A protein has these predicted regions:
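ABC family nucleotide-binding domain
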Residues: 1-200, 204-207
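Conserved beta-strand-loop-alpha-helix hinge in the C-terminal portion
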Residues: 203, 211-225
Protein backbone atom coordinates (compact mmCIF):
# COMPACT_ATOMS: atom_id res chain seq x y z
CA UNK A 1 0.00 0.00 0.00
CA UNK A 2 1.22 3.48 -0.89
CA UNK A 3 0.04 6.88 0.34
CA UNK A 4 1.10 10.04 -1.48
CA UNK A 5 0.12 13.57 -0.49
CA UNK A 6 0.30 16.52 -2.88
CA UNK A 7 1.29 16.55 -6.53
CA UNK A 8 4.36 17.19 -8.69
CA UNK A 9 6.92 19.32 -6.81
CA UNK A 10 4.95 19.18 -3.55
CA UNK A 11 4.47 15.41 -3.64
CA UNK A 12 5.30 13.59 -0.41
CA UNK A 13 5.27 9.80 -0.13
CA UNK A 14 4.09 9.11 3.41
CA UNK A 15 3.91 5.32 2.93
CA UNK A 16 5.88 3.56 0.24
CA UNK A 17 4.62 0.12 -0.82
CA UNK A 18 4.13 -1.21 2.72
CA UNK A 19 2.66 -4.64 3.35
CA UNK A 20 1.95 -6.61 6.51
CA UNK A 21 -0.74 -8.73 8.12
CA UNK A 22 -2.10 -9.12 11.64
CA UNK A 23 -3.64 -12.25 13.12
CA UNK A 24 -6.72 -12.31 15.35
CA UNK A 25 -5.93 -11.74 19.01
CA UNK A 26 -2.49 -10.24 18.42
CA UNK A 27 -1.21 -7.24 20.34
CA UNK A 28 0.85 -5.30 17.83
CA UNK A 29 2.89 -2.13 18.26
CA UNK A 30 3.60 0.32 15.47
CA UNK A 31 6.66 2.36 16.39
CA UNK A 32 8.78 5.00 14.71
CA UNK A 33 10.04 8.54 15.02
CA UNK A 34 7.80 11.56 14.56
CA UNK A 35 6.98 11.96 10.87
CA UNK A 36 7.92 8.38 9.99
CA UNK A 37 4.42 7.53 8.76
CA UNK A 38 3.12 5.47 11.68
CA UNK A 39 0.00 7.59 12.29
CA UNK A 40 -0.68 7.67 8.55
CA UNK A 41 -0.49 3.89 8.57
CA UNK A 42 -2.96 3.69 11.45
CA UNK A 43 -5.31 6.04 9.59
CA UNK A 44 -5.21 3.72 6.57
CA UNK A 45 -6.00 0.67 8.71
CA UNK A 46 -8.75 2.64 10.45
CA UNK A 47 -10.31 3.64 7.10
CA UNK A 48 -9.98 7.29 8.11
CA UNK A 49 -8.05 7.95 4.90
CA UNK A 50 -7.67 6.12 1.60
CA UNK A 51 -4.42 4.78 0.15
CA UNK A 52 -3.19 6.18 -3.14
CA UNK A 53 -2.43 2.64 -4.24
CA UNK A 54 -3.21 -0.72 -2.66
CA UNK A 55 -5.90 -1.82 -0.24
CA UNK A 56 -6.79 -2.68 3.33
CA UNK A 57 -8.59 -5.97 3.99
CA UNK A 58 -10.34 -6.72 7.28
CA UNK A 59 -11.67 -10.19 8.03
CA UNK A 60 -10.75 -11.06 4.44
CA UNK A 61 -12.94 -8.27 3.05
CA UNK A 62 -11.23 -5.73 0.77
CA UNK A 63 -12.47 -2.26 1.66
CA UNK A 64 -11.26 -0.48 -1.49
CA UNK A 65 -14.59 -0.75 -3.35
CA UNK A 66 -16.77 0.62 -0.56
CA UNK A 67 -18.57 3.95 -0.91
CA UNK A 68 -18.03 6.62 1.74
CA UNK A 69 -21.29 5.69 3.48
CA UNK A 70 -20.41 2.01 3.34
CA UNK A 71 -16.95 2.74 4.75
CA UNK A 72 -18.51 4.63 7.66
CA UNK A 73 -20.86 1.75 8.49
CA UNK A 74 -18.10 -0.85 8.06
CA UNK A 75 -15.73 1.15 10.27
CA UNK A 76 -18.33 1.56 13.02
CA UNK A 77 -18.99 -2.18 13.01
CA UNK A 78 -15.47 -3.54 12.68
CA UNK A 79 -13.18 -1.01 14.35
CA UNK A 80 -12.79 0.56 17.76
CA UNK A 81 -10.59 3.59 18.44
CA UNK A 82 -8.61 4.88 21.40
CA UNK A 83 -6.72 8.16 21.10
CA UNK A 84 -4.14 10.08 23.13
CA UNK A 85 -6.88 12.24 24.62
CA UNK A 86 -10.03 10.51 25.87
CA UNK A 87 -12.27 13.28 24.47
CA UNK A 88 -15.22 12.37 26.67
CA UNK A 89 -18.24 14.67 26.57
CA UNK A 90 -18.12 16.46 29.91
CA UNK A 91 -21.88 16.76 30.45
CA UNK A 92 -22.54 13.07 29.83
CA UNK A 93 -22.03 10.28 32.31
CA UNK A 94 -19.27 7.73 31.87
CA UNK A 95 -21.84 5.16 30.75
CA UNK A 96 -23.42 7.55 28.23
CA UNK A 97 -19.99 8.32 26.74
CA UNK A 98 -19.20 4.64 26.36
CA UNK A 99 -22.55 4.00 24.66
CA UNK A 100 -22.00 6.71 22.02
CA UNK A 101 -20.47 4.44 19.32
CA UNK A 102 -23.51 2.16 19.46
CA UNK A 103 -25.78 5.10 18.64
CA UNK A 104 -24.05 6.07 15.37
CA UNK A 105 -26.50 5.83 12.44
CA UNK A 106 -26.25 2.64 10.36
CA UNK A 107 -24.81 0.74 13.33
CA UNK A 108 -27.12 -1.50 15.40
CA UNK A 109 -27.68 -0.48 19.00
CA UNK A 110 -25.48 -2.29 21.47
CA UNK A 111 -27.27 -3.68 24.54
CA UNK A 112 -27.00 -1.57 27.67
CA UNK A 113 -25.78 -4.63 29.55
CA UNK A 114 -22.77 -4.98 27.24
CA UNK A 115 -21.59 -1.45 28.02
CA UNK A 116 -21.92 -2.10 31.75
CA UNK A 117 -20.02 -5.36 31.38
CA UNK A 118 -17.15 -3.65 29.55
CA UNK A 119 -17.01 -0.86 32.13
CA UNK A 120 -16.77 -3.47 34.88
CA UNK A 121 -13.89 -5.13 33.03
CA UNK A 122 -11.96 -1.84 32.86
CA UNK A 123 -12.56 -1.15 36.56
CA UNK A 124 -15.17 1.60 36.30
CA UNK A 125 -18.19 -0.21 37.69
CA UNK A 126 -18.46 2.42 40.46
CA UNK A 127 -18.25 5.36 38.03
CA UNK A 128 -21.08 4.54 35.60
CA UNK A 129 -23.30 7.50 36.43
CA UNK A 130 -20.62 10.03 37.28
CA UNK A 131 -20.19 12.98 34.90
CA UNK A 132 -17.13 12.62 32.69
CA UNK A 133 -15.68 15.91 33.96
CA UNK A 134 -15.62 14.50 37.50
CA UNK A 135 -13.27 11.57 36.88
CA UNK A 136 -9.46 11.43 36.73
CA UNK A 137 -7.35 11.32 33.59
CA UNK A 138 -6.60 7.64 34.09
CA UNK A 139 -10.27 6.85 34.59
CA UNK A 140 -11.14 8.85 31.47
CA UNK A 141 -8.71 6.78 29.42
CA UNK A 142 -10.19 3.58 30.86
CA UNK A 143 -13.59 4.84 29.73
CA UNK A 144 -12.11 5.57 26.29
CA UNK A 145 -10.88 1.97 26.07
CA UNK A 146 -14.34 0.73 27.06
CA UNK A 147 -15.84 2.96 24.36
CA UNK A 148 -13.46 1.42 21.83
CA UNK A 149 -14.60 -2.08 22.84
CA UNK A 150 -18.35 -1.55 23.20
CA UNK A 151 -19.29 -2.52 19.64
CA UNK A 152 -17.33 -5.81 19.87
CA UNK A 153 -14.98 -4.66 17.08
CA UNK A 154 -12.70 -6.88 15.05
CA UNK A 155 -9.77 -4.59 15.86
CA UNK A 156 -9.03 -1.83 18.36
CA UNK A 157 -6.72 0.87 17.00
CA UNK A 158 -4.94 3.01 19.59
CA UNK A 159 -2.91 6.12 18.70
CA UNK A 160 -0.51 7.07 21.52
CA UNK A 161 -3.04 5.98 24.18
CA UNK A 162 -0.60 6.68 27.04
CA UNK A 163 0.96 9.85 25.63
CA UNK A 164 -1.01 12.21 27.89
CA UNK A 165 -0.59 10.24 31.13
CA UNK A 166 1.97 10.14 33.93
CA UNK A 167 4.24 7.10 34.00
CA UNK A 168 2.32 5.18 36.68
CA UNK A 169 -1.08 5.76 35.08
CA UNK A 170 0.36 4.98 31.66
CA UNK A 171 1.62 1.61 32.88
CA UNK A 172 -1.80 0.83 34.34
CA UNK A 173 -3.41 1.60 30.97
CA UNK A 174 -0.90 -0.61 29.16
CA UNK A 175 -1.68 -3.51 31.48
CA UNK A 176 -5.41 -2.91 31.05
CA UNK A 177 -5.17 -3.06 27.25
CA UNK A 178 -3.15 -6.26 27.44
CA UNK A 179 -5.69 -7.72 29.84
CA UNK A 180 -8.57 -6.86 27.49
CA UNK A 181 -6.69 -8.34 24.55
CA UNK A 182 -6.21 -11.62 26.42
CA UNK A 183 -9.65 -11.92 28.04
CA UNK A 184 -11.62 -10.95 24.93
CA UNK A 185 -9.23 -12.42 22.33
CA UNK A 186 -9.22 -8.87 21.01
CA UNK A 187 -6.81 -7.60 18.38
CA UNK A 188 -5.01 -4.40 19.36
CA UNK A 189 -2.86 -2.31 17.01
CA UNK A 190 -1.14 0.45 18.97
CA UNK A 191 0.94 3.38 17.75
CA UNK A 192 3.51 4.47 20.33
CA UNK A 193 6.74 6.44 20.48
CA UNK A 194 7.97 4.33 23.41
CA UNK A 195 8.04 0.58 22.79
CA UNK A 196 9.70 -0.08 26.16
CA UNK A 197 6.59 1.09 27.97
CA UNK A 198 4.65 -1.87 26.54
CA UNK A 199 7.09 -4.65 27.41
CA UNK A 200 6.47 -7.98 25.71
CA UNK A 201 3.97 -7.89 22.84
CA UNK A 202 3.17 -10.26 20.01
CA UNK A 203 4.83 -8.16 17.32
CA UNK A 204 6.52 -4.82 16.74
CA UNK A 205 6.23 -3.11 13.38
CA UNK A 206 8.72 -0.30 12.82
CA UNK A 207 7.93 2.47 10.35
CA UNK A 208 10.87 4.46 8.99
CA UNK A 209 10.67 6.97 6.14
CA UNK A 210 7.41 5.44 4.96
CA UNK A 211 8.75 1.86 4.93
CA UNK A 212 7.82 -1.02 7.24
CA UNK A 213 10.41 -3.18 9.00
CA UNK A 214 10.16 -6.18 11.34
CA UNK A 215 6.70 -7.12 10.02
CA UNK A 216 5.94 -10.70 9.07
CA UNK A 217 3.28 -12.61 7.16
CA UNK A 218 1.18 -15.35 8.81
CA UNK A 219 -1.71 -17.58 7.96
CA UNK A 220 -5.27 -16.89 9.14
CA UNK A 221 -4.79 -13.15 8.89
CA UNK A 222 -7.33 -10.72 10.23
CA UNK A 223 -5.93 -7.57 8.65
CA UNK A 224 -4.08 -7.48 5.35
CA UNK A 225 -2.51 -4.42 3.76
Amino acid sequence: MTKIYGEAETKVTALDDVSFSVKKGEFVLIVGRSGSGKSTLLNMIGLLDKPTKGKVSIDGFATSNLTDNEISAFRNKKLGFVFQFANLLADLTVLENVLLPSQIPLDPSIPFANAKKILEKVGLEDQLYKRANKISGGQAQRAAIARGLVNNPTIVLADEPTGNLDSVTAQNIVQLMKKMAKELNQTFIVVTHDRRQFGDVDRIITVKDGHVFEGEHMEQMEVTI
